[in-house]
Amino acid sequence: MRVCVATIVHHPEDARIMHRQIRALLDAGHEVTYVAPFSHFNVTPAAGLTAVDVPYDAAYGRARTALKRGVKGADLVIAHEHRLLRVLPYRRPPVVWDVREEVSDGRRARALRRHHVITPATMPEATQVAAAPPPPGDTRVVHLGRLTADNGVRELIGLAERLVPYGIRMDLIGAAGPGVRPLLRDAQRVGLLDWFGHVPHRHALRMTQGALAGLSLTRPPGGTPTKILDYMGRGLPVVTTSPGAPLVEPAGCGLTVPLDVNGILDAVLDLREDPLRRLALGRRGHAHALAHHHWPDHAAAFVARMEDWAGVPVVTHSLAV
């Protein structure tokens, strides 16, 4: 099977796209053409796939041109933005829309009339769960993933400043939007935090281990942040704003706070003062992630579903995940 996977806004090394979906397809012996903004993010395409470069947030014309190249000879298209559904070539294979953003029921229903649709309800979000992560420490907090104003960058910087007197440092692991990069550089220059930029996914996950807490400060009413699963899979207590509550509260693995520096600070300091609570929250999150969100448990089903939608006979795969 030949699959065209396309995004115009996500980092080419996006964990869901590259390290779970594409890797599972490649490990199952399928061919992948990846349409993504490689040049914008200064990323060299991974070995084993065919790359088609596209400008970041490309206009319709340029996105259509890139997608037309990508779908040539493909048996299936996996699109990661709704905008890409508007620039599909007339002659094309079956299309899968992997819903990554908040969308209305009407838009989803319209897409279902023409295409296949993946949502968290049909295919659970997942992560690579560590076998035996170290217990949470008490000297640093971490934020994993893209840094933008909507992801609470200003609050993260404000929190980092308030944590300095307590000897707690902040590690930010992920690329940043152009509008917040100067703020992050200034904060790093004066020693408030450590910003590592984009880090390869497996290494980034290891970097989170042993932190006091994983932070998710998405501005309401944003979608449920999948970084929370990464924290859970590494045994970290989670401090999240309300968009993360649907993951954190059922698992009993963290604290829900308002998008307010004082409230976030209180939550972090409460966790620091209670190592037994930190350990219990981390263990509950890890157990929940292992039971429900461990990618190796879902990879074969994902590949089989793509084969079915492409009209390729389903075979049994042993996936190296």
Q: Whereabouts are the PLM-identified features?
A:
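Conserved donor-binding/catalytic core segment of Leloir-type glycosyltransferases
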Residues: C4-A6, M123, P133-E161, D171
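Conserved acidic donor-binding segment of nucleotide-sugar-dependent glycosyltransferases
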Residues: A251-N262, D270-L276
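N-terminal strand-loop element at the rim of the active site
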Residues: C4-R62, G70, A175-G179
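A charged, aromatic-enriched C-terminal amphipathic alpha-helix characteristic of glycosyltransferases
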Residues: E273-E307
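Acidic donor-binding loop of glycosyltransferase active sites
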Residues: R206-G223, L236
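Donor nucleotide-sugar binding/catalytic pocket of nucleotide-sugar-dependent glycosyltransferases
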Residues: V52, V96, E102-D105, R110-P136, ...
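C-terminal alpha-helical cap of glycosyltransferases
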Residues: H40-F41, W295-V321
